Amino acid sequence: MVIANSVKSSTTNYVVADISLSDFGRKEIKIAETEMPGLMALRDKYQSEKPLKGAKIAGSLHMTIQTAVLIETLVDLGAEVKWASCNIFSTQDHAAAAIADQGISVYAKKGETLDEYWQYTHCILDWGADSPNMILDDGGDATGLLILGSKAEKDLSVLDNPGNEEEIALFNSIKYKLETDSDFYSRIKSNIIGVTEETTTGVARLYQLQKQNALPFPAINVNDSVTKSKFDNLYGCRESLVDSIKRATDVMIAGKVALVMGFGDVGKGSAQSLRGLGAIVKVAEVDPICALQAAMEGFSVVTLDDVVEDIDIFVTATGNYQVITNKNLVKMKDEAIVCNIGHFDNEIDVASLKDYPWENIKPQVDHITLPSGNKIILLAEGRLVNLGCATGHPSFVMSNSFTNQVLAQIELFNKSEKYAKEVYVLPKHLDEMVARLHLDKIGAKLTKLTEEQADYINVSVEGPYKPELYRY
């Protein structure tokens, strides 16, 4: 298994689509830095201290312009980094080129094959005679690869029955690695201090491992920091969903009937996004609390089966499996748009469409003819639409998320003795600090409590202002 299109030197290995795009990438990174005050403040605060000196971070997260600012912040704070994207379509090639041009190992290009994806994930874990000691994950693929690979070292039969194309590529990549390095996964796993996880789906995987007493190292759940989930997931999706649909299709959203499946933070932002452009938005939910929230926001709460033939735009935002199945797909109206804004590609049963005629319109936009003769427009092959068909969330909201990531890496790397093999969240005072770092940029001024007021509600003048279980 050879890495194609790579350049190897004494300082770096990288795989990018076109290294000549680095100047373009650098220009956009400079603009993004002006919109990412949290990360820039951490550079100023910690640059001389270098709290990540000695950290060797294997990063698996969308290789975008905003992620480039995160990577360079980690490096400024002393870390060594190897990076891959956590999605085959989400890389911005000029961002990857700009990072590679700085001598940082990056393995990412837009439109990777599944085989390439798992090759590149192996690359961030393979440091030759050395080893990474931290993981920064988005969706849990880097963590999951180490765990599954360690199991395969002991019993190769765990790789015998792949369930889909993704697992075929994953299992083959592990078999290939074990042919030349029989204890690679367990060796690397034993050197990992901990992982910081970015997204809802990856966090769910971590909690499942914790429940099974199978978590191999401590983990910090960055996703459930308030300044991540209530900003990135909500406000980020509110802007990036319609951006991606319009870039992909040029469709008029006003007047269209849209169905958002899932009304968590991502679903809430998605529903607001579509309604903001004049769509008639309906919501499908399994959780009665979220369903009631949707109804109170003025959305019709329906089931997919009841409305499937009437919907113009389908958006899945559940983090679940086979939310839209073949029996739903074949009933869709002509030119219905189908997309997913959850992390993985299995919310929509795309595999069941493979036997139907496909016409590629442009990258990540496919026309599929159903048995009825109707055609549907599938975006990003059912993968993350906002990164497959657009450039993801705006820089400012990603500054919130990535500031949390940097703080989590600093915390776990420097205070590993405090943490058992469990899943943790960042403390409230750090959440509030992240928010403070972003207020000046938008001209927001905080009111300050008096000592008497603080005493009256039993908090410190400087915070934290809410109990840990407060629901924002």
Curated annotation (Swiss-Prot):
SUPFAM superfamilies: Formate/glycerate dehydrogenase catalytic domain-like (SSF52283), NAD(P)-binding Rossmann-fold domains (SSF51735). Substrate binds at residues 64, 138, 198, 228, 232. Keywords: Cytoplasm, Hydrolase, NAD, One-carbon metabolism. GO terms for biological process: L-homocysteine biosynthetic process; one-carbon metabolic process; S-adenosylmethionine cycle. It catalyses: S-adenosyl-L-homocysteine + H2O = L-homocysteine + adenosine. It comes from the Bacteria. Its EC number is 3.13.2.1. This is Adenosylhomocysteinase. It comes from Prochlorococcus marinus (strain MIT 9312). The gene is ahcY.
